[in-house]
Design a protein with these regions (language model features):
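Short, structured segments at the rim of ligand-binding sites
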Residues: 1-430
């Protein structure tokens, strides 16, 4: 396994172009199996989660053709199975979107329980199951495989989600697309990638209204047809690079963003003392002087995203004063705190609250990523720290960040991906 080696303490300058949204891509790719025709999808981030999904579709018999670095064609017309139980499915959480897609197309599904980031224990799918059952499917889990039987027909209904689950909202939308009648999802998730999925499905012939609000209405159609779609920019990737500037200093133009999606993030960075300016579909962030303490609580969109909580916390380790970070979405999302303490951070965690007392400097150290966003937080800390930081388990990071080493190098960062046995001295020489 390779690792990242970062020689920190250098401010970041230049431009970074944001890739397509990973969270949108991993919902749209499974949706393509419902389409009777060829889907051409642009602005796909070629991160490991996406590559795994594309390989799953190939295993299932779909035609998958990579046109260029960010464009893929998917042809599911030859797909004749509703079973996805290989080990690949267990490697990523979003593989469970195949349940809704298979139910929509075949009225049945067998899908292996998913993997992915391991914070918070096993991610529950009870809201997914509740939604499928309300549509008329019989659900059970056998030997780690989710089995769904909708052979008696799926019928539209009203579904109220106990929590505004992104995963459940996606899965129910997929299953309801070709159900009989109208389905109404109340307390639906409102994240940008929910809207993007709805726009994709509508462009293929679905009838979905209200995505982006807490009530989504889906009127079932008889079939979806092929077409072209371009995925939105990645809100979380953009926020990660902005948090890196807040930590390390400098001035960076973050290109290819939707500024409205960034409001909750830019507000907190401005509160810390960063200068923020919007330029069409670009945002410039500048941090020259010291940053300041803030309080932040993660919430469902349009609140501050849980997927940016670790990265912001890393930047707050160097802010003046004592900051308070409250996690309002997931359990056990402060596992990165032990690694930041190895670098000199003063961070104390009590349940869902982290209290961060800013320090004058962080010091490079060997650390280990425990999940995708925790790994991004360690990269940010390493960029700002004095000395050398070595990050192991970088596979987590590459699940969600396309070309992260190359993008950071273009901003002036001294970061390398090296073989695990290679010394930092050799990496520096390269």
């Amino acid at each position: 396994m390779d690792k990242f080696v970062i020689h920190g303490g250098k401010p970041l300058f230049g431009e970074v172009t944001i890739s397509g949204a990973k969270n949108a891509a991993v919902a749209i790719i499974p949706a393509a199996v419902m389409v009777d025709g060829v889907c051409r999808i642009e602005n796909i981030p070629m991160v490991s989660d996406v590559l795994i999904q594309l390989e799953i579709l190939r295993e299932l018999g779909c035609g998958v053709r990579v046109i260029n670095k960010d464009t893929v064609e998917i042809d599911a017309t030859t797909l004749n199975t509703s079973s996805a139980v290989s080990d690949l499915n267990r490697k990523m959480r979003a593989s469970y979107y195949l349940i809704g897609a298979f139910l929509g197309r075949f009225q049945k599904a067998e899908v292996a329980m998913p993997g992915g980031c391991n914070f918070g224990g096993v991610r529950p799918i009870d809201q997914h199951m509740k939604g499928f059952e309300a549509l008329g499917a019989k659900m059970e889990i056998r030997n780690g495989i989710v089995c769904a039987d909708g052979s008696q027909g799926l019928k539209g209904t009203n579904i109220y989600l106990d929590v505004a689950s992104v995963g459940a909202t996606v899965n129910i939308m997929l299953a309801a697309c070709m159900a009989e009648g109208q389905t109404i999802i109340e307390n639906a998730a409102k994240e940008p990638h929910i809207v993007d999925l709805a726009n994709f499905l509508n462009s293929m012939g679905a009838d979905i209204m209200g995505a982006g609000t807490d009530v989504i209405k889906i009127r079932g159609v008889s079939a979806l047809t092929g077409g072209f779609y371009s995925i939105i920019p990645d809100q979380i990737e953009a926020g990660t690079y902005m948090a890196a500037v807040a930590a390390a200093g400098g001035s960076v133009l973050v290109k290819n963003v939707i500024p409205k999606h960034m409001d909750c993030i830019t507000a907190k960075l401005a509160e810390m003392g960063c200068e923020i300016s919007e330029e069409d579909d670009n945002i410039r962030i500048t941090r020259n002087g010291p940053t300041h303490k803030i309080q932040v609580k993660t919430m469902y969109y349009p609140g501050f995203p849980t997927d940016l909580q670790p990265q912001l916390a890393a930047a707050l380790c160097l802010a003046e004063g004592t900051s308070v970070v409250t996690e309002g979405v997931w359990e056990n999302r402060f596992r990165y705190s032990d690694e930041l303490r190895r670098m000199g951070a003063h961070i104390q965690v009590d349940g869902k609250v982290a209290v961060i007392e800013g320090v004058e400097k962080l010091t490079g150290a060997p650390v280990r990523a425990s999940d995708l966003r925790a790994g991004a937080a360690l990269v940010i800390a390493g960029l700002a720290a004095e000395g050398t930081t070595e990050i192991e388990e970088i596979g987590y990071i590459e699940r969600g960040y396309e070309d992260i080493v190359e993008k950071l190098r273009k901003l002036g960062a001294d970061i390398s991906r090296v073989a695990f046995e290679e010394s930092p001295v050799a990496a520096k020489a390269n």
